[in-house]
A protein has these predicted regions:
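A structural signal for short loop-to-beta-strand junctions that line the ligand-binding cleft
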Residues: 96-104, 201-204
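Pocket-lining segment of extracytoplasmic ligand-binding domains
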Residues: 118, 129-231
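N-terminal signal peptide c-region/cleavage motif recognized by signal peptidases
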Residues: 17-19
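Beta->alpha turn/N-cap motifs
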Residues: 30-32, 62-66, 76-89, 103, ...
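An extracytoplasmic/periplasmic, membrane-proximal ligand-sensing/linker region
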Residues: 23-29, 34-45, 217-287
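Hydrophobic/proline-rich hinge and linker segments of small-molecule sensing/allosteric domains
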Residues: 101-122, 214-218
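A local structural motif
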Residues: 52-62, 77, 151-164, 198-200, ...
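Bacterial N-terminal signal peptides that target proteins for export
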Residues: 1-9
């Protein structure tokens, strides 16, 4: 009997220890980094710095996009996901995922851009034209620019025709007169200016500073682990940001910051942006 009890207690002890070990490892995905090799290359220095600061072990979970990431979280395959504002809204609606840390980048806003020689002066002048919005469902390339059109009194897919073109293809279409404007964020303006040095571009509308990218957490992760993650960013933010921006792929975060007091309400503005493209239920990504 004593041997049986001892064996039982030993088994319970092993299970408890296993649970603690598992809890000390967090599974981490990034929605816009495709594949494990790219994830290790772009986020490796950040991973090392975070593990050293937090005492938690990070296990990369590669995904091929936002849909795979939300499905992985639904299947309890991933704990934390770094994603954009528009994607967060869907994660929250589908899974009740919550924001833990905001990843802010400087000058994160949407614009509408035309050729400098264009007769278009305001968004209202684009009525009846085609407009390219880059990546469909993107906060800064799609929802934000559409909101600028809505603020000018133009209804999506009614007063103008939305198209979705690769950025450089969109510029070529703009030069050819096939589209009237392009929806971009600030860094994209810099990119096309460098890519097309013989062209002059003009911004006809600039949006608000958009809500930041966000590290979100699955509902089943323990509050203690969530608090450890949040505290690590709050106390070691400068070191983590330096590690993050050590790779060229994360240059967009240079000059940015981490915010450990982010709330779901901070993304209500994105929900309103979705409404501008006719979406009032947020359980599916825009495809």
């Amino acid at each position: 009997m004593k041997q049986t009890l001892a064996a039982s207690f030993l088994a319970l002890g092993i299970l408890a220890a296993t649970g603690v070990a598992a809890q000390d490892t967090i599974r981490f995905a990034v929605t816009d980094i495709d594949g494990l090799e790219a994830l290790q290359r772009e986020m490796g220095p950040f991973k090392d710095a975070f593990e050293a600061s937090s005492g938690l072990k990070v296990e990369f979970f590669p995904v091929s996009g936002r849909t795979v990431a939300v499905e992985a979280m639904a299947a309890d395959q991933v704990d934390f996901v770094l994603t954009g504002p528009a994607e967060y809204v869907v994660f929250n609606a589908r899974l009740d995922a919550q924001p833990v840390v905001a990843w802010s980048r400087p000058d994160y806003y949407s614009t509408l851009v035309v050729l400098d020689a264009s007769p278009v002066q305001t968004p209202a002048d684009l009525k009846g034209m085609k407009i390219s919005f880059g990546e469909i469902g993107s906060t800064s390339q799609h929802l934000g620019p559409v909101t600028l059109m809505s603020e000018a009194g133009l209804t999506y897919s009614v007063d103008y025709e939305p198209v979705f073109l690769n950025r450089n293809v969109a510029v070529e279409a703009l030069i050819a007169g096939d589209i009237g404007a392009i929806g971009l964020n600030r860094t994209h303006i810099e990119s096309i200016t460098e890519k097309f040095p013989d062209q002059k571009f003009r911004t006809i509308a600039k949006g608000i500073i958009l809500p930041p990218d966000v590290l979100l957490v699955a509902p089943g992760v323990s509050p203690e682990v969530v608090e450890t993650v949040r505290k690590t960013f709050a106390e070691q933010g400068d070191a983590l940001l330096a590690a993050l921006t050590a790779t060229e792929a994360n240059a967009k975060y240079i000059g940015g910051s981490f915010g450990a007091t982010v709330t779901d309400a901070d993304y209500d503005v994105v929900r309103k942006m979705y409404e501008n493209i006719g979406i009032t239920e947020f359980t599916d990504f825009v495809e």
